[in-house]
UniProtKB/Swiss-Prot annotation:
Domain Radical SAM core as annotated: residue spans: 143-375
Known role: Catalyzes the methylthiolation of N6-(dimethylallyl)adenosine (i(6)A), leading to the formation of 2-methylthio-N6-(dimethylallyl)adenosine (ms(2)i(6)A) at position 37 in tRNAs that read codons beginning with uridine.
Record keywords, A-Z: 4Fe-4S, Cytoplasm, Iron, Iron-sulfur, Metal-binding, S-adenosyl-L-methionine, Transferase, tRNA processing
Domain MTTase N-terminal: 3-120
Localization, UniProt: Cytoplasm
Class of this enzyme: transferase
GO MF term list: 4 iron, 4 sulfur cluster binding; metal ion binding; N6-isopentenyladenosine methylthiotransferase activity
Organism: Shewanella frigidimarina (strain NCIMB 400)
Family to which the UniProt record says this protein belongs: Belongs to the methylthiotransferase family. MiaB subfamily.
EC number: 2.8.4.3
Protein name per its UniProtKB record: tRNA-2-methylthio-N(6)-dimethylallyladenosine synthase
Residue ranges constituting the TRAM domain according to the UniProt record: 378-441
Top-level taxon of origin: Bacteria
Length: 474
């Protein structure tokens, strides 16, 4: 009888990525298969997030539900990971005796050993250390699950924004070596992945070591990943404005695989609030980045994060945020009402914006973003869009579902043999959360790159120095 594993994941794409790696790891090392039913699992793992309000209480509420399962099955192993685990550590075990394992984002690779320790009779295992890049060295080879995939290129953040727990829960910025990233992408491409999303808390801070002891920048990494056979679409998440440098913007000019969509969090349009947040930039500097991006890629669309009701946010501050939203014409946003995160500098500030005012401002902001997004969607009406077919439509399995460059879901009728490939569709209808398309052509009728020899990649970026010596740089 096979052993069963149930993982519940909250939070960001990095947590989703980590959970998929936990599943692969425990399958490879100990033969655990995933189940959606917690009641039939031998191991329950909760991958937590510190970003949302009352994150800790949410964790203990879930553990209370799982305790009843452990009461029925004393051999059940319960583990808590992620950012709340890193933040709370032993306090989780003190409050929830049913928990056997507490691990941080940087120690998930040690899960097989932790589980074995519990099975040998140890009462609790806690490891929330920061062993830097060791995590990636211990993970199994990547497994494709459809035509899109996330690839983590770095961990942590060193920006220390006043509201954010990430530097304390995931550690400071550590980049994966270049060869490791390229190998993982190539392995996924060989399994049929066509779109890769490079992942990290602050990807544009990437500085990966190369085999010859040089450093690869994020801009160089983007070009290298885009040159891998089979990868025809490239995304990345998430960036910080203060390191969104010109060399990254230049990639948008010469790398068509990089999509015309960017998520670049700004958090506020008020310079005063940005200073309080310790963001390291002003609103005008953010707008300068967007202006240069649109010069390089005129059709690029921008999404952002916004925190509403940060301590001291006045009506004028909120008006500045709304002005920035109008000036930049954001296509999408993740917007949240501020709530203090324990241990952050902002937690010491008076939370002086009323809940009612926060809710009103959030509604106003989200309404404006929705209007702007619908305007962009209507502009797509009648156009032909290239989409990557991800699978059957959620609402109608007889139809297909794909995604445009600007992350809009398109439902359309076509043969299911197109799943995993690119198709062109004509947009014929617009809805709030999706588009309707008509099939135009399949991939066999497109002029997509099929094969590119290494010599051709190198020749594209050949440089000769003053002595006539040729160097190849990405």
């Amino acid at each position: 009888m096979s052993k069963k594993l149930h993982i519940k994941t909250w939070g960001c794409q990095m947590n989703e990525y980590d959970s998929s790696k936990m599943a692969d790891l425990l399958d490879d090392y100990q033969g655990y298969t995933l189940t959606e039913d917690a009641s039939e699992a031998d191991v329950l793992l909760l991958n937590t997030c510190s970003i949302r309000e009352k994150a800790q209480e949410k964790v203990f509420h879930q553990l209370g539900r799982w305790k009843s399962l452990k009461d029925k099955n004393p051999n059940l192993i319960i583990g808590v990971g992620g950012c709340v685990a890193s933040q709370e550590g032993k306090a989780i075990k003190d409050r929830a005796q049913c928990v056997d394992i507490i691990f941080g984002p940087q120690t998930l690779h040690r899960l097989p050993e932790m589980i074995e320790q519990i099975q040998r009779g140890e009462k609790a295992v806690i490891d929330i250390s920061f062993p830097e890049i060791e995590k990636f060295d211990r993970l199994p080879e990547p497994r494709a699950d459809g035509p899109t995939a996330f690839v983590s290129i770095m961990e942590g953040c060193s920006k220390y924004c006043s509201f954010c727990v990430v530097p304390y829960t995931r550690g400071e910025e550590v980049s994966r070596p270049l060869d490791d990233v390229i190998l993982e992408v190539a392995q996924l491409a060989a399994q049929g992945v066509r779109e890769v999303n490079l992942l990290g808390q602050n990807v544009n801070a990437y500085r990966g070591a190369t085999h010859d002891d040089e450093i690869c920048t994020f801009a160089e990494l983007l070009r290298l990943v885009a040159s891998i056979d089979g990868i025809d679409r490239l995304r990345f998440t998430t960036s910080h404005p203060i390191e969104f440098t010109q060399d990254i913007i230049d990639v948008y000019e010469d790398t068509p695989e990089l999509v015309s969509f960017l998520h670049l969090p700004v958090q506020s349009g008020s310079d005063r609030i940005l200073t309080q947040m310790k963001r390291g930039h002003m609103a005008i500097e953010y707008k300068s980045i967007i202006r240069r991006l649109r010069k390089a890629r005129p059709d690029i669309q921008i999404s952002s994060d916004f925190i509403i009701g940060f301590p001291g946010e006045s009506k004028d501050d909120f008006a500045d945020t709304m002005k920035l939203i109008e000036d930049v014409a954001f296509d999408h946003s993740f917007s949240f009402i501020y709530s203090a995160r324990p241990g952050t500098p902002a937690a010491d500030l008076p939370d002086d914006v009323s809940d009612e005012e926060k809710k009103q401002r959030l509604a106003i902001l989200q309404d404006r973003i929705t209007q702007q997004a619908m305007r962009y969607s209507r502009q797509m009406l009648g156009t032909v869009q290239r989409i990557l077919v991800e699978g059957p439509s959620v609402k109608n399995p007889m139809e297909l579902r794909g995604r445009t460059e600007n992350s809009r879901v398109v439902n359309f009728e076509a043969a299911h043999t197109h799943i995993g490939s690119f198709v062109d569709v004509k947009i014929v209808d617009v809805y709030t959360n999706s588009l309707r398309g008509e099939f135009v052509r399949g991939e066999n009728e497109m002029d997509l790159r099929r094969s590119l020899r290494p010599a051709e990649i190198l020749a594209k970026h050949k440089q000769d120095d003053a002595l006539g010596v040729t160097h190849f740089k990405p």
